Amino acid sequence: MLVKSCIFLSFLAIAAYGQAHLKYTKEMNDPEYVQQNVHHQGHGHAHGGHGHAHDADGGCPYAKAAAAEAATAAAHDHGHAHDHDHGHAHDHGHAHDHHGHSHDEEEDHHHGHAHDHHGHSHEDHGHSHGAESAKQVGDEYQYTGFLSFLNDAKTRLWVYAISATLLISAAPCFILMFIPIQANTSESGPLLKVLLAFGSGGLLGDAFLHLIPHATPAGDGHGHSHSHGHSHGGGGHSHGAHDMSVGGWVLGGIIAFLTVEKLVRILRGEDGHGHSHGHSHGGEKKETKEKDSKDKVAKKEEKPEKDEQSIKVTAYLNLAADFTHNFTDGLAIGASFIAGTTVGIVTMITVLVHEVPHEIGDFAILIQSGYSKKKAMLIQLVTALGALSGCVISLFSADADALADAAASSWVLPFTAGGFIYIATVSVIPELLENSSFFQTVKEIFAILTGIFLMYLIAIYE
């Protein structure tokens, strides 16, 4: 029994040794079996330590081939890092080129072929993205109709910028059509004063919250970084000198508008006063009985005539200041559309909301001057020439951004702000002090605050 057991155990040992020897022989003579076996058994090791396994295998081509296959599978499986894995796999293939074994050369060729195919798919992918991008940028209008000319970038820029400028100039006129005022009559007097109050609030808000901050380095937006850095390079004195110049130009605008109005009133006042005086004295000599009544009528008519002349001068000054202001707005619109369509549209909306209080105030001043509603609206369109000229100059300029920044940092904005302050405080607000009830005063103050608040919102948005 013991002998049989020993024989049986010996037989099992011989069988196990033969199977192991057979397996070793197959591994050494069957490359496909080596690739499958090594790939399945050692895949985790090759993937986890790819470079380490390559250095430790020495001259065994089958282990290196298996490691190459594992690297290929890892490069394809990890799709989130195509560029990194793809380049790493090429380094591995380059290492295989140093081995001269024929089987390794075959595996290396196959490995390189797989990577060539992978690279080709990447090129196709990039080509697809490039075609899609070109389609979106170059062929914005694919119609064969009248809009096809907008596919040209330069034509599209001009059409967009000029159209935006015309829209800003024409849109307030549509709002003015719904204002129930036809002329300066006693019936429309209370509403007209409310509009004058709203316009004066818009002028003051525009001057103190928009024009003056844009002319100073502290609120210069994009230009702030350039002027501020330049100021620090030249010392703090330059910063203070610029602030002083802004205040000086504001005062200069106030004095200039005062001087112009005084000169115009002197010239027109002498003619009107002489005519009124001569007519009064002539009537006094011819008809002594009607002297008192005519003097009373002459006094009543003389004051409205002087007031009308005063407000007409104010209307002309306001149109001149508004023309200059619209010129700077046109420069900004042109530069914005050069920067991009989205930037241009945002700037257009901002300027449009900003211009509505201005146009309503200008309309009220023109109506108060004696113009009819239709004539006042037509005169308002004259100021659109300032915006158009500014936009065209900006589009023709080689550096539109620098041109807009130069206009913003020059004397134009603070000088215009001084004119707006003068018109609001000297010419418009005194009109609100005459013949006002308590309820009318409340409405006028609320209108002034509304105009200022709109400019405040626009300043925050900008």
UniProtKB/Swiss-Prot annotation:
Role this protein plays: Zinc transporter.
Q: In which tissues is it expressed?
A: Expressed in somatic tissues.
Q: Which residues are glycosylated?
A: 184, 326, 435
Q: According to its UniProt record, what is one Pfam family this protein matches?
A: Zip
State the protein's name: Zinc transporter zipt-7.2
Q: Which family does it belong to?
A: Belongs to the ZIP transporter (TC 2.A.5) family. KE4/Catsup subfamily.
A GO BP entry is: intracellular zinc ion homeostasis
Q: How does it sit in the membrane?
A: Multi-pass membrane protein
This entry's Gene Ontology molecular function terms read:
zinc ion transmembrane transporter activity
Q: Which cysteines are joined by disulfide bonds?
A: none
Q: Where is the composition biased (Low complexity)?
A: 65-74
User: What lineage does the source organism belong to?
Assistant: Eukaryota, Metazoa, Ecdysozoa, Nematoda, Chromadorea
User: Methyltransferase among the record's keywords?
Assistant: no
